[in-house]
Amino acid sequence: MTADTQIPRATAQRLPIYYYYLSSLHEAGIKRINSTEISEAIKFDAATVRRDFSYFGALGKRGFGYDVSALLDFFSKVLSQDKLNKVAVVGTGNLGQALMKYNFVHSSNIQIVMGFDVDPKKKELKIDNEKGETIPVYSIGDLKSELNKENVTIAILTVPGKSAQEVTDQLVDAGIKGILNFSPIRITVPNSVRVQNVDLTTGMQTLIYFVDNFENIKSAK
């Protein structure tokens, strides 16, 4: 893969799924796997798996499949697993605090290092996470200075919709390059900033629809 290689967004979103599945195979001592086996395990069709992998060149061999260790090492580099990504949570209500306590305990390259809130009562709040670390919470007024101190370029946004865009503008001004957006609105950012929206309500409503209409969807295939 070269720096000019264009990877579709859908493919990029599947890469962590491939990585964690390959990690589980490696831990289980499995040496080799083919696209059909990957497909059956993670519920993507085999053609999608092969197409996703093809964007990165020749990762496997016809008749042999894929070497698990080599493939895991490759995706580890693609996903920058050897680089520590410092993250800030903006909005330390119930959801924000839950994320800070969890702190991506099963990931070695993601670390929430600070939180921010508009409530002055939370300024001295410290959150103990599942990794045994204590995460400080700062005033939103200290956003830019604290982010710059720790070279944080990724933020998780868990503020109410009415303040989401204003806070987003502050994050962009502070140099944030990526935002995981849990707020109920679609925020606007410059082209240089990436946003991943997480809408729990929409996801649940979609799930309910599929549960209620399972037979109709099944028969339409």
From Swiss-Prot:
DNA-binding span(s): 17-56
SUPFAM superfamilies according to UniProt: NAD(P)-binding Rossmann-fold domains, Winged helix' DNA-binding domain
Entry binding sites for NAD(+): 91-96
Pfam families linked to this entry: CoA_binding, Put_DNA-bind_N
GO biological process: negative regulation of DNA-templated transcription; response to redox state
Molecular function in Gene Ontology: DNA binding; DNA-binding transcription factor activity
Domain of life: Bacteria
UniProt keywords, alphabetically: Cytoplasm, DNA-binding, NAD, Repressor, Transcription, Transcription regulation
Protein's UniProt keywords contain Transcription regulation: yes
Record localization: Cytoplasm
Classification via Gene3D superfamilies: NAD(P)-binding Rossmann-like Domain, Winged helix-like DNA-binding domain superfamily/Winged helix DNA-binding domain
GO cellular component: cytoplasm
Chief localisation class: cytoplasm
Family, per entry: Belongs to the transcriptional regulatory Rex family.
Job of this protein: Modulates transcription in response to changes in cellular NADH/NAD(+) redox state.
PANTHER family hit by this protein: REDOX-SENSING TRANSCRIPTIONAL REPRESSOR REX, REDOX-SENSING TRANSCRIPTIONAL REPRESSOR REX 1
Record's subunit section: Homodimer.
Protein name: Redox-sensing transcriptional repressor Rex
Originating species: Oenococcus oeni (strain ATCC BAA-331 / PSU-1)
Organism ancestry: Bacteria, Bacillati, Bacillota, Bacilli, Lactobacillales
Gene that produces this protein: rex
